[in-house]
Amino acid sequence: MVPRLDFAEAAKGVIAMARFAGARGWVPATSGNFSVRMNELSAALTATGANKAELDENGVIEAEIAGAKHPRASAEAPLHLARYRAAPGIGAISHMHSMAATVLSRRHAGTGAVRLEGWELMKAFAGVTTHDMSIDIPIVPNDQDTDRLAALVEERLDKDSICPGYLIAGHGLYVWGASAAETIRHMEAFDFLLTAQLHEESAR
């Protein structure tokens, strides 16, 4: 179901995600961006250049999901808006640059995915009820043309996948959920799982 939030409510969710990531060092040097769907037409989105660790409502804009450009929108806004258009059940999206996600996105770029398998914390993802499975996190090559990159991402993603995120090679991680609260849970789970995966691979 598509949410029905006013701008102030949606902005609170954006701020919560941004500060959560900022407090953990996942959005260094003003990187990263966060959004919350308001309805079928609009989303609240971090403005370009905002310090995510100290974000307030002045650093959040209202963007049209159809894709009309906002003068303060981040260059990566098209990646958020394309996900909202493709999947009405998505209520919030985060983009962060955690160390493990960024390193693994380069290490596995040639295979096109990072495989998580057997980790108990995969059950933090919505719809996952067992550790006894594998989840492939797709990796797409980076591109400074973010409209083209957004189209590539949507072409690459498996619409039936249970994985609530994807990686951009050498860049970072996109994560989503039905709400800001669920997205925060997914962010924390991804960071733990990718850190565990990186440690395990490095120990081999």
UniProtKB/Swiss-Prot annotation:
- List residues binding Zn(2+): H95, H97
One BP annotation, GO: pentose catabolic process
Keyword set, alphabetical order: Amino-acid biosynthesis, Lyase, Metal-binding, Methionine biosynthesis, Zinc
Q: Which reaction is the catalytic activity of this chain?
A: 5-(methylsulfanyl)-D-ribulose 1-phosphate = 5-methylsulfanyl-2,3-dioxopentyl phosphate + H2O
Needs which cofactor?
Zn(2+)
Q: Which GO terms describe its cellular component?
A: cytosol
Q: How is the cofactor bound?
A: Binds 1 zinc ion per subunit.
Query: What Gene3D superfamilies does the entry give?
Result: Class II aldolase/adducin N-terminal domain (3.40.225.10)
Q: Which domain of life is it from?
A: Bacteria
Q: Which Pfam families match?
A: Aldolase_II (PF00596)
Q: InterPro entries this protein is in?
A: Aldolase_class_II_sugar_metab (IPR050197), Aldolase_II/adducin_N (IPR001303), Aldolase_II/adducin_N_sf (IPR036409), MethylthioRu-1-P_deHdtase_MtnB (IPR017714)
Give GO MF terms, alphabetically.
aldehyde-lyase activity; methylthioribulose 1-phosphate dehydratase activity; zinc ion binding
Question: According to the UniProt record, what class of enzyme is this?
Answer: lyase
Q: In which pathway does it act?
A: Amino-acid biosynthesis; L-methionine biosynthesis via salvage pathway; L-methionine from S-methyl-5-thio-alpha-D-ribose 1-phosphate: step 2/6
EC number(s) of the enzyme? 4.2.1.109
Q: Which NCBIfam families match?
A: salvage_mtnB (TIGR03328)
Q: What family does the entry list?
A: Belongs to the aldolase class II family. MtnB subfamily.
User: What is this protein's function per UniProt?
Assistant: Catalyzes the dehydration of methylthioribulose-1-phosphate (MTRu-1-P) into 2,3-diketo-5-methylthiopentyl-1-phosphate (DK-MTP-1-P).
Q: What is this protein called?
A: Methylthioribulose-1-phosphate dehydratase
Name the gene behind this protein.
mtnB
